[in-house]
Curated annotation (Swiss-Prot):
This is Glycerol-3-phosphate acyltransferase. One of its GO terms (biological process) is fatty acid metabolic process. The gene is plsB. The keyword Transferase applies. It comes from the Bacteria. GO terms for molecular function: glycerol-3-phosphate O-acyltransferase activity. It comes from Pseudomonas putida (strain ATCC 47054 / DSM 6125 / CFBP 8728 / NCIMB 11950 / KT2440). A motif (HXXXXD motif) lies at residues 310-315. GO terms for cellular component: plasma membrane. It is found in: Cell inner membrane. Pathway: Phospholipid metabolism; CDP-diacylglycerol biosynthesis; CDP-diacylglycerol from sn-glycerol 3-phosphate: step 1/3. The HXXXXD motif is essential for acyltransferase activity and may constitute the binding site for the phosphate moiety of the glycerol-3-phosphate. Belongs to the GPAT/DAPAT family.
Amino acid sequence: MTRSPLHRLIFGGLRRLLYLWVRSETINQSSMTLNLDRSRPVFYALPSPALTDLAVLDHECTKAGLPRPVLPVAVGPLQEPAAFFYLTPDPDWLGRQDKSGAPPTLERLVAAVSQHAEEDAQIIPVSVFWGQTPASESSPWKLLFADSWAVTGRLRRLLTVLILGRKTRVQFSAPIHLRELVQHNKGHERTVRMAQRLMRVHFRNLKTAVIGPDISHRRTLVKGLVHAPQVRQAIADEAQRENLPLAKAEAQALRYGNEIASDYTYTAIRFLEVVLSWFWNKIYDGIKVNHIEQVQGIAPGHEVIYVPCHRSHIDYLLLSYLLFRNGLTPPHVAAGINLNMPVVGNLLRRGGAFFMRRTFKGNPLYTAVFNEYLHTLYTKGFPVEYFVEGGRSRTGRMLQPRTGMLAITLRSFLRSSRTPIVFVPVYIGYERVLEGRTYLGELRGASKKKESVLDIFKVFGALKQRFGQVYVNFGEPIRLAGFLDQQQPGWREQDHGPQYRPEWLNATTARLGETVARHLNEAAAINPVNLVALALLSTSRLALDERALTRVLDLYLALLRQVPYSPHTTLPEGDGQALIEHVRSMNLVAEQKDALGRILYLDEGNAVLMTYYRNNVLHIFALPALLASFFLSSSRMSRQLLGQYVHALYPYLQAELFLRWTPEQLDEVIDQWLVALVEQGLLRQDNDLYVRPAPSSRQFVLLTLLARTITQTLQRFYMATSLLINSGQNSLSAEALEDLCVMMAQRLSILHGLNAPEFFDKTLFRHFIQTLLQQGVLHADAQGKLSYHDKLGELAEGVAKRVLSAELRLSIRQVALHRDDGLETSTL
């Protein structure tokens, strides 16, 4: 456009029009500090074609008294119509760019200087930045359009000029003298390449310094995926299977890669940091982070995989935010394809999300591309994050691990273990979860709603509510190599080819998932809402006098301080009264006053919701509650009998709640808890016997409330075993037993007023049945019918009668005995 007087006239008009809005300044270098030789011709190199950048450059040169880039210039006999060129050449008429080619102007300049020993040309690399640096920009709107490493289109550039044009900065760099390069006598082509390389490195380093590093691998990685041997083979197989041309199958693989890969940008990270800082301060009273220093120590030299528990959609944003604020690289986060929505999906992708389909079944090409993508992330050292639970927990419990991502990780590590992999469990605890009411509806039977871009606007409703504090605890890291050394000592000597899938993979992956879940539970952050929910839900009327509730909470705190669950578990500050005041301020408990004081209770709206927060810490209290349960029906028990009954029930509690102790450690922990219960006055020791308090005493009430913490879990166990025994050997399949258990639990919840939908959660029954099979108590025949060992009767009656009241056992047995065909086929 600037090659003729007419073009220069039009360009001048456009520049003046642009500067009706744009304001620019030169940073770092001035015309005085460039050390230009005014007797030698000056050229300007811009990184890529942009008319607005050229106009800003021309304006700043005019202002600084530098030669204008749009005017003709001579180098010996060479006459150039303009004194600028783009390092990336102008696109052709189809919009294509030959990035490997050299700018024609640079080719001619090198030739002219080479042929005329007295000539030289000074090339000044010039960078134009629109807006402030992302690190200093505080406006989220402006950060959306700030300079980035991504290639921008004309519409985005127009919006960038309109939004950021008032703070445009130009940086002139020290000139490159072509004479110095030519004197190396490398020949024409190598000299041109040398000049290009110098400018490319310069532009990249400068851009990194100004807008942050290029942390996106998308532009280079996706194309590289299809050249990996495993993906090439999958492409060939796809072409043969679907009778497609090879190029078409390869194009499909590229589409999969683009669908999956994240597009990390520093500006998006800064945008999210600014927006989320405002958001957290609006809805939360603070974010408490514990044990992050161990991650800061382990991150260098390791491939870090963050494995947080999954309670809310904002888990991923919260963790990335905290890592960034604490000087750690935000991870690439696995997100469900359902979140790849318009606007939101693009922002999440630029913030580090990579998207995965819910199932890979029946699509080997997609599987190959996804596996290779993850393998590339791991081998290049990018931190990664995924949720081993798969989806968000609607009940507040730790869900059974989904092992798909763990299996991919394990196979990638076997394929290349040069970079040690470490899993970092992250427990995220909310005093009030954003989706609480949604979970409540889903637990009551409402269908799960599909995510929509309109859901964003629902967030604004949350700004009027109080959500308390958020607790983020980093758990004990799991070194994958060390884990494999324990599980499969000879794994290092085995031949681990790209397609290697050892026989022990599935079992080892399952154990890895259980280990991650246990480490997550070990890092639990116990908060005031958890403890108040635990106390009130243990009462028959969901209510307690304020003084009584204070005593219960003080007891819980004393027990937890005396027998810490793990070094990574954290407790709330303050005493029982302080905890009550905190929960009251969040409107999670109702109150009624009378002449004797205040009664705190859970109303119908909050009763079910509070089961969510109780379940967050159920595993912490499982063992002391189980010990307390034995004294509801027995006034005294020997240490030997207590140990026997705890060992009988422990495998099932451990499988459901991911308790941390091995069977070998159990006796020591039982003794610690018995000492604590004695010191708190809930039990009395008489030689080898433990004796409960008098039923009329305050201590017995406290013991009863502690025991009721685990009652519903034990009821479910008893339901399943009673149904099995009353059905007889080889009469029920596992699926039929699950259905019967759910219907029975629904009926009992009505009869006994159990206001907890997870009481009849099918997955809990399913996992209990699986554990019975694993323990050898059940056996499935060829037709899938279940038979049981004599141990089941001992478990059902011998142990159950010690921990469940006679009334409850009778009610469960009656429903089990009197079930008929209608019960099996109808809903209750």
